Amino acid sequence: MKNTVKLEQFVALKEKDLQKIQGGEMRKSNNNFFHFLRRI
């Protein structure tokens, strides 16, 4: 359970970063990150 909560908090932080930085390298790295999560 703890791992799931930490993951949700991490994703929430990533979403906040996306809202602050629209486009650019952040968006590319986030797309790669989500593709990585889908493979698991």
From Swiss-Prot:
GO terms for biological process: establishment of competence for transformation. Residues 1-24 form a propeptide. GO terms for cellular component: extracellular region. It is found in: Secreted. GO terms for molecular function: pheromone activity. Coiled coil: none annotated. InterPro entries: Competence_ComC. Keywords: Competence, Pheromone, Secreted. Its main location: secreted. Acts as a pheromone, induces cells to develop competence for genetic transformation. Belongs to the ComC family. This is Competence-stimulating peptide.
